[in-house]
Amino acid sequence: MKKFALSLLAGLVALQASAATPDRLTIVNQYVDNVLTKAGDQYHGQSPTPLLADGIDPRTGKQMEWIFPDGRHAVLSNFSAQQNLMRVLVGLSNLSGNPSYKQRAEAIVKYHFQHYQDESGLLIWGGHRFVDLKTLQPEGPSEKEMVHELKNAYPYYDLMFSVDKEATARFIRGFWNAHVYDWKIMETSRHGKYGQKMGALWQSPFEQQPPFFATKGLSFLNAGNDLIYSASLLYKYNKEDGALVWAKRLAQQYVLPRDKATGLGVYQFTQALKRDETTDDADTHSKYGDRAQRQFGPEFGPTALEGNMMLKGRTSTIYSENALMQLQLGKDLGAEGKELLTWTTDGLKAFAKYAYNESDNTFRPMLANGKDLSNYVLPRDGYYGKKGTVIKPYPADNSFLLSYSRAYTVLPDAELWRVARGIARAQGLGELGSAAGKDVKVDLATKNNDPYALFALLDLYQASKVKDYLSLAEKVGDNIISTRYKNGFFMADPNRQYADVDTIEPYALLALEAAVRNQPQSVAPFLNGAGFTEGGYRMEDGSTRISTRDNEIFLLNVGETLKPNNKK
């Protein structure tokens, strides 16, 4: 009888705990309701638009503002920086059965097409354009000439095509038309002009150029990624064969210059055309030529080019953002995506072989030819740091765990698994196994609360159906809720002043719920995309802070203000 009473008491306690702790879908539902209420249009009375602010102070409800150098304030609403949220809204409708969230996402897309698409097809969004939620007027930092720019944004084209197929197709064509400066040699740039007259587009002639040919436009991979992704989706949804030809052609430009011995690279397939001279090493404008060559060339020779710099940040673009996007395209496009899968997995294997330090879970900073730059002291000022800066190995974080785990589900390769396994161990997740599902001993007491880790575990679970991975994902999900969900919003640090409505914690929790229900298709695949806003920002003392990014504002704790960055 005593045993029965104790058992009954334990059951009641567990039941009460369960009742007191909302399930993950309820949490995401609460969060989304808070976003739609507090980040919504509060400025237009009985006729509010469906638009949303990018950031919210959870304590006061104040919407995050951009302060221009002339002192004007604007409530920042940048649709390119809300694409993860759009995926959350659709996924929440799919899992909850409540269509209103998807309908809100559709309304936001429709509103942008109706009000913020120019004659060339481009939208008012991206790194240097946004909408002031107060006035509904397009805005942008003037020193960037209000150009169009996307970097690893990966808009939710699936939704956009479902809302307005022709407007989405117009945008993608306009995107390529504005950002490919010379189709014959594939000269691209991260900056595109609005209002451009449509050219020959997919019918343009092309002649393959040698690796690292000199151009005025800078072929950064983070900008190339969005071009590749958009044209591939245009082919998928609109059957424009030429779009896929050019998408794969652009993707290949980043493969052809890879070092022949190591297979590493590249971040750019061109180098900056030298158009002027300077004796000031600290002036890193691209008109003075390739910035890596200026800073590293005297010691390392002609291979020291920006495209060959395998440094922190650049490698995230190559082996995380690009990798996740191309792995997904490879799956979506079937036989047409086979090359994308091969290029991506080959690159990840090369990076694993030459850069990964399993002993301390770091990546070596390198040149693409394999030259290890660990602990190298910069001999002069330049693009990569001040004279005297020491280049250090950098941690292999959960974003790399995700890209290597996802690649392994496509190609079960031992080198890919070695990196995923090593990162997981270092990130407190325990032992993933000698291979997927073999000798598994995960740590179900982990304190890991990183949504990237959760996404990675879900990939491994979907590929292997090993329950241990799902159980560990649930634990990480619980940790996310207990440590990052405060005042009705998700924030990596509860002391932050503003919550970012595009944060990925609710996205990861929805993906987890979908996996538990065996409905993974209910939530869009995670691509690690993110928009941004950058430009001149007015400091409290009235000075202008050049090249301020919105993520710097999101990193401020309550009571903190931006510090000078000394950029010119």
Regions inferred by a protein language model and the residue ranges of each:
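Hydrophobic h-region of N-terminal signal peptides that target proteins for export
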Residues: 10-18
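Generic cytosolic/nucleocytoplasmic N-terminal low-complexity/intrinsically disordered segments
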Residues: 1-2, 567
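Glycan-recognition and catalytic cores of secretory/periplasmic carbohydrate-active enzymes
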Residues: 19-568
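Enrichment for repetitive, rod-forming helical segments
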Residues: 9-10, 94
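A ubiquitous, low-specificity "background" feature that marks scattered single residues
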Residues: 8-9, 508
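Sec-dependent signal peptide recognition
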Residues: 2-8
